[in-house]
Amino acid sequence: MSAKKLEGSSAPANRRDPYEVLCVSKDANDQEIKSAYRKLALKYHPDKNANNPDASELFKEVAFSYSILSDPEKRRHYDNAGFEALDADGMDMEIDLSNLGTVNTMFAALFSKLGVPIKTTVSANVLEEAMNGTVTVRPLPIGTSVSGKVEKQCAHFFGVTISEQQAESGVVVRVTSTAQSKFKLLYFEQDSSGGYGLALQEEREKTGKVTSAGMYFLHFQVYRMDTTVNALAAAKDPESAFFKRLEGLQPCEVSELKAGTHIFAVYGDNFFKTASYTIEALCAKTYEDTTEKLKEIEAQILRKRNELRQFETEYRKALARFQEVTNRYTQEKQTVDELLKQRDTIHSTFSVVKTPSGNNLSNGSSSKAQGDESKGDGDSAGEEGGTENRDKSKRKWFNLNLKGSDKKLG
């Protein structure tokens, strides 16, 4: 079961043009799309429209449209071929856990535990409070860390103030959880009204015995890994999962920060319990060697991704050739076995001794029977002749003796 089958996550039955839904132009930039989405999501959120049955469907439509236009790859596919291209790619939706009932949340938690990739959105309540500027922001000085626990579908906000020198050197903000909690690391930009709009978000990933997420503002392109892409590729074609392993690599939108105070937040993404975390802000000046290593490894991974794309083509050709040769081997083996069998059958026909078939006897069998019969007759005749000769011998012997005896007596 995929995430898009859960309540509040399925695509609208009658799909409208995403640009039309969000009221933006075809050439709208990312910021314009984000701003339009935030306004419409807050306007149609079901929690704020309990008496409006149409609001829930409109909210789904807005979320569905944003999921397309906020993703560069999906947006490109849609611009080229419409919804058909997205359907072919098996696009998944994100779900808002705060909009799910207890039963659906339990199902989501179960399937997530089984390894099904389920994307979640930030609660509309959190986004609204941030936009209204009513959130509590705690200071997080560079070079320090803060630990805490955040309730599910809630967020803890932190203000990171950086100097000109620190901004030039680069800044890193990371969150880890030794309890392996699910969370999101959020980055907000301040708008003209004094509120905060969501600009970036990073999903936690399991790395070793902890879960972690980070944002790296180091003045060069840094990438995030979307493991959902890998999971979906593995589900579609397990044999090609390896080749898609680096396809989830996506560029981070912001690569540097200006001097000033920047707002980050840790969002609790567990299904039921609180999320434990430690957030820290670092200046890259003291991690120059590590920064260079990261820059180098990112470049190597990008090259390897291109190499894998080419190698997959070669592998597919070789695999097809191997399958072809294997099939021919089986066919050739069967042909050779059949030819040798026919050869043996032909050899066996060169013989006067043939296998009986039904009630008909072969010539060889008849000759043999007649020969045996003749042999039997000869044996009987021989036995009779021998008896007569023995009788004659006896008579002759007795006659000789008798004649001799008569002479002597006489």
UniProtKB/Swiss-Prot annotation:
Keywords in alphabetical order: Chaperone, Coiled coil, Cytoplasm, Cytoskeleton, Endoplasmic reticulum, Golgi apparatus, Membrane
Membrane topology (UniProt):
Peripheral membrane protein
Which residues, by range, are in coiled-coil regions? 284-344
Keyword check for Chaperone, yes or no.
yes
* Traits of the deletion mutant: Roots and hypocotyls reorient slowly upon gravistimulation. Plants are normal for phototropism and for responses to hormones such as auxin, abscisic acid, gibberellins and ethylene. They also accumulate starch like the wild-type. In response to gravistimulation arg1-2 lacks cytoplasmic pH changes in columella cells and has a bad repartition of auxin that accumulates in root tips instead of forming a gradient.
Bias type Low complexity, positions: 357-367
Q: Record's superkingdom?
A: Eukaryota
Give me the Gene Ontology terms describing cellular component: cytoskeleton; endoplasmic reticulum membrane; Golgi membrane
The cross-references to Pfam families, in alphabetical order and at most eight, read: DnaJ
Q: Tell me where in this chain the J domain is found.
A: 17-82
The free-text tissue note of the record is: Expressed at high levels in root cap, root tip meristematic region and elongation zones, and at lower levels in mature part of roots (at protein level). Constitutively expressed in seedlings, etiolated or not, roots, rosette leaves, cauline leaves, stems, flowers, siliques and pollen.
State one molecular function term (GO).
cytoskeletal protein binding
Which CDD domains does the record associate with it? DnaJ
* Gene Ontology terms: biological process: positive gravitropism
Q: Region Disordered: start and end of each range? A: 351-410
Q: Where in the cell is it found?
A: Cytoplasm, Cytoskeleton; Endoplasmic reticulum membrane; Golgi apparatus membrane
- Keyword Secreted: yes or no? no
Q: Which family does it belong to?
A: Belongs to the DnaJ family. B/II subfamily.
According to its UniProt entry, what is the function of this protein? Plays a continuous role in plant development probably in the structural organization of compartments. Seems to be involved in early gravitropic signal transduction within the gravity-perceiving cells (statocytes), where it influences pH changes and auxin distribution. Probably affects the localization and/or activity of auxin efflux carrier components (PIN proteins) or other proteins involved in lateral auxin transport.
PANTHER family registered for this protein in UniProt? DNAJ DOMAIN (PROKARYOTIC HEAT SHOCK PROTEIN), J DOMAIN-CONTAINING PROTEIN
Name of this chain's protein: Chaperone protein dnaJ 15
Lineage, uppermost ranks: Eukaryota, Viridiplantae, Streptophyta, Embryophyta, Tracheophyta
